[in-house]
Amino acid sequence: MAISTPMLVTFCVYIFGMILIGFIAWRSTKNFDDYILGGRSLGPFVTALSAGASDMSGWLLMGLPGAIFLSGISESWIAIGLTLGAWINWKLVAGRLRVHTEFNNNALTLPDYFTGRFEDKSRVLRIISALVILLFFTIYCASGIVAGARLFESTFGMSYETALWAGAAATIIYTFIGGFLAVSWTDTVQASLMIFALILTPVMVIVGVGGFSESLEVIKQKSIENVDMLKGLNFVAIISLMGWGLGYFGQPHILARFMAADSHHSIVHARRISMTWMILCLAGAVAVGFFGIAYFNNNPALAGAVNQNSERVFIELAQILFNPWIAGVLLSAILAAVMSTLSCQLLVCSSAITEDLYKAFLRKSASQQELVWVGRVMVLVVALIAIALAANPDNRVLGLVSYAWAGFGAAFGPVVLFSVMWSRMTRNGALAGMIIGAVTVIVWKQYGWLDVYEIIPGFIFGSLGIVIFSLLGKAPTAAMQERFAKADAHYHSAPPSKLQAE
């Protein structure tokens, strides 16, 4: 494919803008707290959109529309499950985690929080959770870099190797320079770009076909199963698809946004903004794939690339329906989705190494400036390892990413949820829940019992492990109980104004 000058220019302007935000954030980064959590200063709007953008990777604009285009509306169950899971996460975890991390030694990372919350003097929780984050997020990063490279490769006709570096460079630069603030501010811009693309594109597709009723009729004529929500699905399959929503409770890059909010009271507004954004984006992505069926059915001569790879449905519609300048902006939304998730994961890996390994075990007396620079160097190191893994897109290691969502959800999800909801939880309960949840996911995926998505049994057994081992062992210390009570009381305290009341 020949390089389109308008698309190249819009991509370059977009990337330059992200790097510029990184430099602006650099001026606001004074210490390690700023670099890792933005000094806990995010307002509700940035908290909301940053959480959304860090969650939704290229899957939102490629994977989901492609699945709907290929199989019809029945593929939207996963979107319903994700929406419910995200809402429950915002409702039960977000505000509480913001408070509890502050009350437990002002924890900057999940491993740091687990150590303080359960008074883990052995630091086993810190080591295990930090290593799990490093392993899976490095592979997650590699997977994101592959997605960005594929976009550059297909859009500009670059070689894969050139596309690999072009796609990763900008994200690495602004994350390296600006840290958490750069990542959160760019996430906000990227989330805005994503929702713009996912609202405008399906509207133009419907107009291109001749209207909503006409589009629906064409889709039904092609196959009535396209509009059947239960097509080929039984109860177990629907539960498995909706079970993806359980993953939200344990995703470190999303939970970090809650920890960075300026107040637990602002979480209420952030939840409303984020859920509105998420519902509109998921509905738009479903609509792109769904109405794309009608468009390409009416224009079979244009359907070659989509028939070969259904995940190109958004890309092809953007290039066909819009002039190259607008198409460039819309396709930048895919890059935005990839970059927003990648930058968050790079920063989580960097913080795990710097806070939970370097500072905790090697340099307890390290200065704030030293920690900031170690954090920056670790962003670079993790990125280079991820690029090395991504150099061969068929690398079998990348297959481990399929474990990551379920693994984090089952290993960390119940631990996070119980830690902010149940004062009787102990260190042994947390350790048992983490190990049982993770092992269940690995074993269940290998054997595929009952065809249930492995996060569901992992979450259930992990939760049971927490309750059983917490009740069997010694009760939490008086200090732990008191700290929990104070944090819980603070969480339930009245907001500063009635405007913030739920």
What are these regions (language model features)?
Residues M1-E502:
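Membrane-embedded helix-loop-helix hairpins and adjacent transmembrane boundary segments
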